[in-house]
Amino acid sequence: MIGIYSPGIWRIPHLEKFLAQPCQKLSLLRPVPQEVDAIAVWGHRPSAAKPVAIAKAAGKPVIRLEDGFVRSLDLGVNGEPPLSLVVDDYCIYYDASKPSALEKLVQDKAGNTALISQAREAMHTIVTGDLSKYNLAPAFVADESERSDIVLVVDQTFNDMSVTYGNAGPHEFAAMLEAAMAENPQAEIWVKVHPDVLEGKKTGYFAALRATQRVRLIAENVSPQSLLRHVSRVYVVTSQYGFEALLAGKPVTCFGQPWYAGWGLTDDRHPQSALLSARRGSATLEELFAAAYLRYCRYIDPQTGEVSNLFTVLQWLQLQRRHLQQRNGYLWAPGLTLWKSAILKPFLQTATNRLSFSRRCTAASACVVWGVKGEQQWRAEAQRKSLPLWRMEDGFLRSSGLGSDLLPPLSLVLDKRGIYYDATRPSDLEVLLNHSQLTLAQQMRAEKLRQRLVESKLSKYNLGADFSLPAEAKDKKIILVPGQVEDDASIKTGTVSIKSNLELLRTVRERNPHAYIIYKPHPDVLVGNRKGNIPTELIAELADYQALDADIIQCIQRADEVHTMTSLSGFEALLHGKQVHCYGLPFYAGWGLTVDEHHCPRREQKLTIADLIYQTLIVYPTYIHPTLLQPISVEEAAEYLIQTPRKPMFITRKKAGRVIRYYRKLIMFCKVRFG
């Protein structure tokens, strides 16, 4: 049992999970209960002095708590609960006067060596994912005229415990700035103000400093890694910024004695630095990281509140951060129906942006439209307002049912360059694929996702009945030809020569006269919602079998090859290890994974299936939980779809009537809007 005097500590969500023990709230006016084994306090705060004295008098050990090094999305001073804590029964990591549990962990070479590969993976994620202790700050945007020789000097909050117990104070901050200017006479000096100071909650050591010709105050709240990319050297007193600079590969000079100094990785200027180095010894950056982030810190799963690990927290923070950063500003999404605006709202609106669906907007920073059709309608107005056009479309794991039946999507994509199915220009997805360089962990994640999708038979719409091959298909090459919606934008912008289902089917038959061809009409065409029907007599002439209401994944599994114009079924077939022939230029063609009729010169890289899966399903789309209305990972979206009962498909050759479609629209709008 751990005793808690501090109301602030007592209010920390999931405290008992962090401490791995039950906790009891104590009163300063009563004796320490016998069942209490230790007293927890917050670092070296002055408020901890009395509980420490009480614990000492009662013969109870003291446990010191602090925020972990990857803490949360927003700042702690704004009330954001921690996702990570450190629990130290020796001292606390920022107290340089004596060894802490962290210092002892760093010196445990064997324990850290076992975690080196994990440390490298996490370090890579933090640097490339622009992650830090706090993760709500936007990325730093440099001026085009920026100098190349820039030195960063990091301020801290006045009387911060890490400064005091890092054997530093105002003198060290003054000496640091003086040294930075003297040692880098040709450089511009950037002074980074602490986020808590920017929020107006605290003051800093450089509060009186003013910008000069050489000194620039970085007074905006920006993410550390995005700022560090622009500097050549970093000066700190005891700030955690110094360690994050080491992760970014920058030389770091320390004027105090932070936890990462004294190991041979920093340029230490403190008068007592030799004594600290003698006590601490040497360590590599990976060993320091493994000890601090993987062993010293404790983590809570942001979604379940259960004990977790650094990688779960990093993945969640990266997901939330990417969602927020992609939607910064004042978004204007004009010309949408009530239905479309209702389903787009949770995908576009965040806690940090503004969103308008009106047909007129005067202060927007971007115009969001639905696909190519919306772009054509609003391009001129966006150009008149000098607004960038962002396109949205359905994602690749959409729903359990058809979009044309007005079922709300589980995933959408937001593309600021083009859109994935438009082969006439680059898209965000194409750029991601052209630059894909996966780490081993990312490759493993992609393969694990592929296996889960294959074993669960997930597809975009998750519709259809069981399918078995007819007996006459035995010993023949099985070719699946998926039909498409012929007036769909992917046909208009992704095809070159063959542009209709009939042309495709005829071409496949001509080139494969002895194959057993299965034609699978598009579900939207089958249910009467969209264009693309082939007369029955022509299908009978060109195909051996028509799989009407069959599950597309079961059709893929039973085929040897899939021949398509631009259908997503081709991508799904690649996941199942099938040979795919592309007669158009879908997003997955041109990377060395398909047999291609046409060439796209922009697609320069030869990809693995892991590259394609990772960028297409993990990075590019946004997944929103339909009831929580929060961003979720592709794995969580897949599990949600797996647990959702599959819907039957009602086949008709007539387009659904206007009354029926309005009725469907009303029902689904009410479900989305009012739950």
UniProtKB/Swiss-Prot annotation:
* Entry keyword Isomerase: no
Main location group: cytoplasm
The record's subcellular locations are: Cytoplasm
Q: Where is the signal peptide?
A: none
**InterPro entries hit by this protein:** Capsule_polysaccharide_synth
One cellular component term from this protein's GO annotations in UniProt: cytoplasm
Q: Work out whether the entry's keyword set contains Transport.
A: yes
Q: Identify the Pfam families for this entry.
A: Capsule_synth
Annotated GO biological processes are: polysaccharide biosynthetic process; polysaccharide transport
Organism's domain of life?
Answer: Bacteria
**This protein's UniProt keywords:** Capsule biogenesis/degradation, Cytoplasm, Polysaccharide transport, Sugar transport, Transport
Q: Which family does it belong to?
A: To R.meliloti lipopolysaccharide processing protein LpsZ.
Query: Mind telling me what this protein is named?
Result: Capsule polysaccharide export protein KpsC
Q: Which organism is it from?
A: Escherichia coli
Could you read off the lineage of the organism from its UniProt record?
Answer: Bacteria, Pseudomonadati, Pseudomonadota, Gammaproteobacteria, Enterobacterales
